[in-house]
Amino acid sequence: MSVDSMLCDRIDIAKQLIKRSEALSRSRVGGVEGGAKLCSKLKAELKFLQKVEAGKVAIKESHLRSTNLTHLQAVIESAESLEEVVSVLHVFSYNDQFGEKQSLVVDVVANGGHTWVKAIGRKAEALHNIWLGRGQYGDKSVIEQAEDYLLASSQQLVQYSSPHIIFAFYNSVSKPMAEKLKEIGISVRGDIVAVNTSQENLPEENYLSGSESDCDGDDTAVLHVSKVDTENIVASIAFPTEIKVEACKRVNLDITTLITYVSALSHGGCHWLFKEKVLTEQAAQERQEKVLPLLKSFMEAKELFACESAIKDFQSILETLGGPAEKERAALLVKSITVVPDQPSERASKLACSSKINSRSISIFGTGETLKAITMTANSGFVRAAANQGVKFSVFIHQPRALTESKESSATPLPNNYASSNLL
């Protein structure tokens, strides 16, 4: 292929990848984190190639082959192959074995955060040579990179488990490297190719000194040379269609969840116009999407916990604002919960209080972390504020529902023909 035709091909690929990256960003409600960064990198590549095409930049054919497009294409193809992609080109911080702060770019974070993918576009032969120490000075082998991934993932738990790591090879990987990756706990995706070992005779003075050589009196030493055979594919591994995640079986209930679970709004009492605007808004949200089935589905077959502070404050709120049916449902719910003392985790206790962070929330969410439970909550403000201080909790966030049974006497029933456009 001539340089001109290769250039045209690269420009076409860049344009297609930009479209695919934009579609990827739209594939998730709220967007895919890092999608804009990915798109920006692709547009920069396209701009550079168009400058080359216009004669503004001189470039060698070898440089044209080694643009970032290969890697960016691998990132997009990986993201398109997986479910629940939450981010691309995400930077994670971690401490290395010496305690030094390091950062790691994970190409694709999928499966709701449970899967990390490194997309690799380099050729198998180059990767194999670097691993054997034949690369350029400073080149880091894939195995060394895998060790970084393992260390970083052990410090970035998702629901108290380390993310599963996949290395996706788009230009093959040698069998010995694939086996080594699997040995240390990395899943491999892509074509696995054979390595042929040949023997070359070298003059002994070019290889080993006489005292070091196993050759007895020979003038030559045998050098075993391995070479990747890209034509000999010994296995081809696709992305798993379904990655099984060991689900956390413990749930910690926040006050907002306790209230939502027993609220009259969640039990059919959403066909009212309340005097309080916030209650009317919540009633409209409930008519649009029922919250109780979501809560029950998540809580099913799990152990339910709540700390003493949460139960005490819930019962206090219930006594003041709850209606008879809401109190009855609350009594049944509390019976199914294991109530534990407040025992906030060390990192939760270090959170600085603010308008969104108070001592009660620290106790509730921190106790959930100590229990290694997922905290169910409608308090997304606290979750965001804590994350801004570097503390990310394992949470299930849902819409809030207030106690409304006692408010129904002063509310206006919705007429049967009430239009959805007049919900509020």
Swiss-Prot record:
A Pfam family assignment: DUF5614
Superkingdom, taxonomy of origin: Eukaryota
The protein, known as: UPF0415 protein C7orf25 homolog
InterPro entries cross-referenced by the UniProt entry: DUF1308, DUF5614
Entry similarity comment: Belongs to the UPF0415 family.
